[in-house]
Amino acid sequence: MGRFEDDAEVEDREVSPALTVGEGDIDASLRPRSLGEFIGQPRVREQLQLVLEGAKKRGGTPDHILLSGPPGLGKTSLAMIIAAELGSSLRVTSGPALERAGDLAAMLSNLVEHDVLFIDEIHRIARPAEEMLYLAMEDFRVDVVVGKGPGATSIPLEVAPFTLVGATTRSGALTGPLRDRFGFTAHMDFYEPVELERVLARSAGILGIELGAEAGAEIARRSRGTPRIANRLLRRVRDFAEVRADGIITRDIAKSALEVYDVDELGLDRLDRAVLSALTRSFNGGPVGVSTLAVAVGEEATTVEEVCEPFLVRAGMIARTPRGRVATPLAWTHLGLQPPVTGIGQAGLFD
């Protein structure tokens, strides 16, 4: 089985929930501009609406907001919507960009009252900047240290009242003190296919694509519950329809296009199937350690564990057990193989 040698190939998978190279502008054009336009996440939308409306009636700033969940579900879009709903300016940065306390102090000093500060990947913020953020979130001030050693002095600086919106794909990686300073936390879940159909219909309208209802359902079914993936697959299918058909996307056109791009009926791509194939054919379904499995497909263990495994576990094709990874009966049947008699759930597997 061939190695996926180029890291960019792994990162630019059609079913990757992360933004790929050159995708930012197109992704931005499809973003909803208000809570009313935002599709899916009904509980989060309702809760956010109450938080924002309450703040507007009081004439103050809402509590700091933490948005958590897998990539590609709309956390950045919601941050933009929060600023728009409040009629406030949005300042954007990311956790990795805040390496020093001075980086954060410079950004905070430029805020004006009621601004929204969005920190993406907030779990990756450096500790000195995080500790400065505590005081800014609680008391709207920061202490800037001038000088070094015994002669260093701390100068307090006032910060205009602002709302921090943090986004994270790993809420468990946040420190307790930082997490506790968010007054409202929303967890975003994967989308149902019917919700993705609505996302696709909206995007098709914006992009001027003729998309049949059955075609939308076909694309939605393969989009791994993620709007960003759905929109990417829509653009790939559009290219196929324009080059090899009359530009109209029917169900058959969608199926043919996604076969070309190696996205099967459950949303698995070539790398996913390579992992399942190694697990079933080379290791008889497991259990097997992730490092051994990674060697079998010629990949890094972190790639298998962080890129492939989350979806395969959620799709019910791989189970994590104390003894290692195990292929479920669904994995065997998806590959057209007969599950062994001693499959998952049999006595002794989890001993």
Swiss-Prot record:
Ranges for region Small ATPAse domain (RuvB-S): 192-262
Domain comment (free text): Has 3 domains, the large (RuvB-L) and small ATPase (RuvB-S) domains and the C-terminal head (RuvB-H) domain. The head domain binds DNA, while the ATPase domains jointly bind ATP, ADP or are empty depending on the state of the subunit in the translocation cycle. During a single DNA translocation step the structure of each domain remains the same, but their relative positions change.
Annotated keywords: ATP-binding, Cytoplasm, DNA damage, DNA recombination, DNA repair, DNA-binding, Hydrolase, Nucleotide-binding
Protein localization: Cytoplasm
Biased composition regions of type Acidic residues, renumbered to the chain: 1-12
Residues that bind ATP: L30, R31, G72, K75, T76, S77, E138, D139, F140, R181, Y191, R228
Region listing for Large ATPase domain (RuvB-L), in residue ranges: 1-191
GO biological process entries: DNA recombination; DNA repair
HAMAP family: DNA_HJ_migration_RuvB
The encoding gene: ruvB
Residue sites binding Mg(2+) per the record: T76
Residues annotated to bind DNA: R320, R325
Oligomeric and partner information: Homohexamer. Forms an RuvA(8)-RuvB(12)-Holliday junction (HJ) complex. HJ DNA is sandwiched between 2 RuvA tetramers; dsDNA enters through RuvA and exits via RuvB. An RuvB hexamer assembles on each DNA strand where it exits the tetramer. Each RuvB hexamer is contacted by two RuvA subunits (via domain III) on 2 adjacent RuvB subunits; this complex drives branch migration. In the full resolvosome a probable DNA-RuvA(4)-RuvB(12)-RuvC(2) complex forms which resolves the HJ.
Region (Disordered): 1-23
EC number of the protein: 3.6.4.-
Protein name: Holliday junction branch migration complex subunit RuvB
Domain of life: Bacteria
